[in-house]
Amino acid sequence: MGMPMSNKVLLYTRTVARMKPSMVVARLQRTKSVSEAPVDVSLRPLGIACGALDADAAYAARFDLDALARDEFLLINETQKVDLTRWEAPEASHLWNFNLHYFEYCVPLAARYAAGGSREDLDLFKRLTLTWMAACKYPRGDAWHPYTISLRLVNWLVCLNLFGDVLVDDGDFMCAMTASMYRQYRHLLANQERHLLANH
């Protein structure tokens, strides 16, 4: 059962009373949409992978890489089966679903591939990103929240770097991925979280 309306009014009143006027104005502004724009897919991804961090065993242990192939994701110490046609786990918490859109679990997958992993790691990464692009329609849901975008873009760039030329040589995939990343970046630029006045 939800919170009574009188409690909601009090909650919002107390919250707004502590905010700076610029924060209130920024929060009241609607999400700004950006149109699709052409992007030069011949550009090579930036080299931002850091092996000491991205291939760290303790970092990788936070995720069950083998379960990803079954569409099961271990995030914040909880495993959920995800419907990749919707890219959400309805029974999971909002925080868990937010974490789903970070794609952090793909960094150790790409690191495993770079260390001599199998073609299945590459195919799984491609399947996850392509199903995400198909399911997460612009600009709806947690997928398009500025915070999830800011983390996902970095994680995708790290993965592209770790997978290397084998992805760059897949023109169709790189075209789709680069176009998606560019749109996410433009959306992030247009929808910065000015109402927070801080980094997360």
PLM feature spans:
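Detector for methionine-enriched segments
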Residues: 1-5, 19, 23, 133, ...
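Aromatic-lined, polymer-binding surfaces characteristic
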Residues: 94-200
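Extreme N-terminal leader/anchor segments
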Residues: 2-83
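Active-site substrate-recognition loop segments, prototypically the cytochrome P450 B′-helix/B-C loop
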Residues: 84, 88
